[in-house]
């Protein structure tokens, strides 16, 4: 169904009529000029992410349902990175005429799945037209106790540096998808050239056979057996609210924290800069999944570089006082990778052979040409 057939109000009703509000802080959601929220005795956290087609995602290999899920999770992750609890979400979408109502239905299936996982209310947004493809802007609103919110600037000398999960898998998933995309378009271009030549020579039978091959190519699905984890990390990342809950249960308050969206190197430098400190990170301690290592070897890439600079992991990077060592070391899903130092000692990566290298930001830069 064309979106124009529904109109703005019909589309709003279709996407939001089945939304149920779950949070006491949501006093009024979709349906008026503004949502109404109430946060007595709490600090309010607000984060926004914009995702642009061709810059942040490629619809060649991510479907609308996964895109909706991922778009929500990258925002939810920011709230958890401040040690907060996500409560509400505002969703704005600009889309071109090539998109149908059913595409938005699928987007919202994924979006709602992410929100339902963490009991988040969708309370508003906007939908408009676009001449340049799909643009998504999502704002997530959360809450936290004043003395529990964690910033980037609290790391202190001797603090332990920790990360959750494993790193580099999302980047390797992206490399895998990009490789298959290049193969697909290469084969398609070759067939298109052959069809053009066949038409020029008047060989209708060859044109028919080549067109059949094009149709078969369009229906072809790459074999990703053994690489499912990499695809899941790229297409459907998970915000680490589970780690926030584990830290609270263990009585651990991080001194600094952020999520790993642009790469471990970049995020370490952010924390060190804002906390006025240095760090020593040990290569052998960086958690890397087996599939990530295998894929890096297959593509002749340095797996540590992928883990340090790949980005889109949406794991948590945080520091804790050294006195919490015994509490943190046994928490499942958390790995100690180094410690905080004096600023004059710099930001160093200690390689497996003992050599030290300066950590540089080589991760994702959305404004890089």
Q: What is the predicted function of each stretch?
A:
Residues 1-369:
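Helix-biased detector of long, well-ordered alpha-helical tracts
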């Amino acid at each position: 169904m064309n979106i124009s057939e529904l109109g703005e109000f019909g589309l709003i009703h279709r996407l939001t009529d089945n939304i149920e509000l779950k949070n006491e802080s949501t006093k009024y959601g979709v349906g008026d000029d503004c949502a109404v929220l109430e946060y007595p005795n709490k600090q309010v956290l607000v984060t926004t992410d914009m995702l642009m087609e061709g810059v942040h995602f490629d619809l060649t290999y991510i479907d609308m349902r996964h895109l909706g899920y991922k778009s929500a999770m990258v925002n939810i992750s920011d709230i958890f990175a401040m040690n907060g609890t996500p409560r509400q979400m505002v969703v704005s979408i600009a889309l071109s005429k090539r998109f149908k109502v059913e595409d938005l239905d699928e987007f919202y299936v994924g979006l709602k799945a992410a929100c339902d996982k963490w009991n988040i209310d969708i309370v508003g947004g906007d939908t408009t037209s676009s001449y340049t493809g799909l643009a998504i802007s999502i704002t997530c609103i959360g809450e936290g106790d004043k003395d529990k919110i964690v910033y980037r600037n609290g790391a202190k000398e001797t603090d332990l540096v920790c990360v959750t999960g494993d790193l580099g898998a999302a980047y390797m998933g992206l490399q895998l998808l990009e490789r298959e995309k290049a193969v697909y378009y290469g084969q398609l271009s070759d067939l298109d050239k052959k069809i053009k030549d066949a038409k020029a020579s008047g060989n209708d039978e060859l044109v028919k056979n080549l067109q059949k091959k094009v149709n078969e190519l369009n229906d072809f699905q790459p074999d990703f057996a053994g690489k499912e984890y990499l695809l899941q990390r790229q297409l459907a990342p998970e915000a680490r609210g589970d780690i926030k809950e584990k830290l609270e249960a263990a009585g651990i308050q991080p001194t600094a924290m952020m999520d790993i969206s642009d790469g471990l190197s970049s995020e370490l430098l952010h924390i060190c800069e804002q906390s006025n400190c240095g760090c020593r990170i040990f290569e052998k301690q960086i958690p890397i999944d087996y599939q990530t290592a295998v894929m890096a070897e297959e593509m002749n890439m340095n797996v540590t570089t992928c883990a340090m600079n790949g980005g889109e992991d949406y794991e948590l990077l945080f520091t804790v006082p050294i006195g919490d060592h015994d509490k943190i070391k046994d928490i499942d899903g958390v790995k100690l990778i180094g410690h905080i130092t004096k600023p004059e000692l710099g930001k160093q990566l200690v390689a497996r052979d003992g050599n030290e290298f300066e950590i540089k930001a080589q991760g994702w830069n959305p404004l890089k040409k």
